Structures are given as structure tokens and as C-alpha cells.
From Swiss-Prot:
Zn(2+) binds at residues 132, 134, 225. This is Methylthioribulose-1-phosphate dehydratase. Its EC number is 4.2.1.109. HAMAP family: Salvage_MtnB_euk. Substrate binds at residue 114. GO terms for molecular function: methylthioribulose 1-phosphate dehydratase activity; zinc ion binding. It is an enzyme of class 4 (lyase). Binds 1 zinc ion per subunit. The gene is MDE1. The keyword Cytoplasm applies.
Length: 273
């Protein structure tokens, strides 16, 4: 699925000023091509209420090429021609967003402010896909944790991580970066929470700190904002995002019923041999 090799990053101009716009990087009849997958994913996420009002986004890495949804586009109307493309390796020499070089830029949009956060998932976790949603269940979970933190004055860690165990859907998550297998039913899923900032790109350092502190996580919640989820490939990132949204909704409804997220349940051992 590797697209035609692009020209070097040095030969490409920045932002929307490309003289050769390299449209061949986003035009393909292959439905699994990143430039086709991102609009399809975003249209699906829009129907779920995850990316309303142009919020949220997605990015896919194919070897060195990174494909990104643009800023300000209505996600259900996105087309392959709207996709940005950049070289991941080139970012090491131009980390400043204002100097970021794109191999391919759409004419009518601006780069997503999520770009440095997506790049963090690719560089720090070798992810193949990163998804950002404004799921209202994710936001509600962060608000519940915020309320818990305010009621536990003096405990600085309260409200900074979402934890849940003994729920079947937890099996949808891997054990962590570089580890084999998935979490089990009795394991505890932990998703760190970072505080929101006025500008999306300013979240990057806090996202990276959360990755360092919780090396096994595949997601980071942003308080009053949404969630970032990444995976080895599109399939894993998508299914973990779906599993997380299920768990967030379940967690909110459990709180309404007075049920705890963390329980001590004895394993049921089969006796039949």
C-alpha cells in the first residue's frame, strides 16, 4: 500500500505554497489508501457524534508518509483531495509548526492544530494511526474525574487517570507498547487525563508527558475536550476508539447508578475438564 515515493522534503514548499502540489500522493482507487481511509473514517465518526462542528480528526502513517485531515473541514464532507501529507523524518529537522514542510497541501484549508499530537503518537509509540474525537462521553468522564478531584483536596493524583476493571470490553486493548497480547477481563484499564489548553498544539508536551508516565496506554483524555487514541494500524486504533467510547458511556451510566468503576471480583474457575 506504499504510495509512489515523494520528492524530498527539501524540494517541497511549506504550507499551501507548493508549486508542485503532489496530488498523486492522495489520488488512488485503492479503498485502503490513507487518503481514502481518513475521509471514510471521519464520515463514520461524524455519524457517531465524535467529530461534530469540524472538531476532531485523524491521521495515518504509511512508512515515512503521514496523512492528515485538515483544519476546518466538515468531517462528513471530507474528500481525499483535502488531505495533507508530510514526511515524518523531515519533522526532526523542522519541529517548529510555522516552519513545517508539507509534501502535499490542499488549496482551501489550513493544517490541523492536532498535527504535533499525531506526530507524537507516531514518533513515541511507532503508531500507524491516531484518532482524535470530541466524544461527549469522553468529556463527561473527565468532568466526573474533575469533580472527584475537587472532593479530594490534597491528593494531587485524584482525577488524573480514568480506571476501570472487570468489564469484558477491556479485552479490546493491548497490554502496552512493545508488549504482546491484550488486557484480560480482570485487568485494570488506565487512561491518563491531561488539562486542556487554549490552543490545541499546546497540548503536545502534556500528551508526551502522559505517554512517558503511562507507557502502556493507547489513549490520553483531555479534560473538557475529548480523547486521543492511537494504535499500531488503522484497524487497532479504530477498534480501541470504539471500545473506549463504549467504556466511557458505561462509566458515566455506572456513576448515575452509584456503581464503582473499580471492583474486587473473585475469578470464576471452571470445574469441567
Amino acid at each position: 500500500m506504499c504510495p509512489t515515493c515523494p520528492p524530498s522534503a527539501a524540494s517541497a514548499s511549506s504550507e499551501n505554497n507548493n508549486t508542485d502540489n503532489n496530488d498523486h500522493l492522495v489520488l488512488s482507487s485503492d479503498s485502503s489508501h490513507p487518503a481514502n481511509l481518513i475521509p471514510a473514517l471521519c464520515a463514520k465518526f461524524w455519524t457517531l457524534g465524535w467529530v461534530t462542528g469540524t472538531g476532531g480528526g485523524a491521521s495515518i502513517r504509511d512508512n515515512d508518509l503521514v496523512y492528515l485531515a485538515p483544519s476546518g473541514v466538515q468531517k462528513e464532507l471530507m474528500k481525499p483531495e483535502d488531505i495533507y501529507v508530510l514526511s515524518l523524518a523531515a519533522q526532526a529537522t523542522s519541529p517548529n509548526p510555522k516552519q513545517r514542510v508539507y509534501l502535499r497541501s490542499p488549496a482551501n484549508y489550513k493544517p490541523s492544530q492536532c498535527t504535533p499530537l499525531f506526530l507524537a503518537a507516531f514518533t513515541k509509540r511507532n503508531a500507524g494511526c491516531c484518532i482524535h474525537t470530541h466524544s461527549h462521553w469522553a468529556v463527561l468522564v473527565t468532568l466526573l474525574l474533575e469533580r472527584e478531584r475537587s472532593s479530594k483536596e490534597g491528593d494531587e493524583e485524584k482525577g488524573k487517570v480514568f480506571e476501570i476493571n472487570n468489564i469484558e470490553q477491556i479485552k479490546g486493548f493491548g497490554r502496552g507498547f512493545g508488549k504482546s497480547g491484550n488486557l484480560g477481563y480482570h485487568d485494570t484499564l488506565r487512561i491518563p487525563v491531561i488539562e486542556n489548553t487554549a490552543h490545541e498544539e499546546d497540548l503536545t508536551e502534556f500528551l508526551e508527558e502522559a505517554m512517558d508516565k503511562y507507557p502502556d496506554t493507547y489513549a490520553v483524555l483531555v479534560r473538557r475536550h475529548g480523547v486521543y487514541v492511537w494504535g499500531e494500524n488503522v484497524h487497532k486504533a479504530k477498534t480501541m476508539c470504539e471500545s473506549l467510547d463504549y467504556l466511557f458511556q458505561l462509566a458515566v451510566e455506572m456513576k448515575q447508578l452509584g456503581l464503582p468503576w473499580i471492583t474486587d471480583i473473585e475469578p470464576t474457575i471452571p470445574t469441567r475438564k
